[in-house]
Amino acid sequence: MNYLKELIYRIRGEYTTEKLIKMGMRVGENFTRLNDVILDPAHCWLIEIGNNVTMAPRVHVLCHDASTKQFIGYTKIGGVKVGNNVFVGADTVILPSVTIGNNVIIGAHSTVTHDITDNSVVVGSPAKIICSLDEYLGKEKKRMKNSKCYGCLLYTSPSPRDRSV
């Protein structure tokens, strides 16, 4: 089955997480890579992903930026480091030379152009901090508890973040 999966990925020009790890990418435990996530295959050895990281559909992690090549003859290349306990929303682009701290939520359709500090929630293009993780989680717990939304569950078991405190 793994051979068939690998063959399909190769035909489509995509790489499995396992293949990228063999090519030098570093990944911690509990990494969830949803559909159509692109992890720069040409520079995957510059990507480091921590524990408990989720990348929603169509996230792009790029370690190169060729926007300057036509004008000055050089391509910018830089590593991307994603900390522990990070959620990256759908259609987000993470550009080269960026470090994302621990305990971070990145909203959908964001463009991460600079480092993100620990315990932050960021959104936008370019991504900007909108609040601390604790503020966001407090608001969301209250909202979910008081709303009648289908599929909203308030988990009472501690998250990996809570267990480390």
Predicted segments, located by residue:
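Conserved small/polar residues in nucleotide/adenosyl-binding loops
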Residues: 155-162
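Left-handed beta-helix
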Residues: 29, 34-35, 50-51, 56-57, ...
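A contiguous, mid-protein "functional segment" used to position or interact
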Residues: 115-153
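Flexible, solvent-exposed loop segments that connect beta-strands
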Residues: 68-74
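Conserved H-X4-D acyltransferase segment
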Residues: 41-43
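Extended, small-residue-rich solenoid/repeat segments and analogous flexible loops
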Residues: 1-39
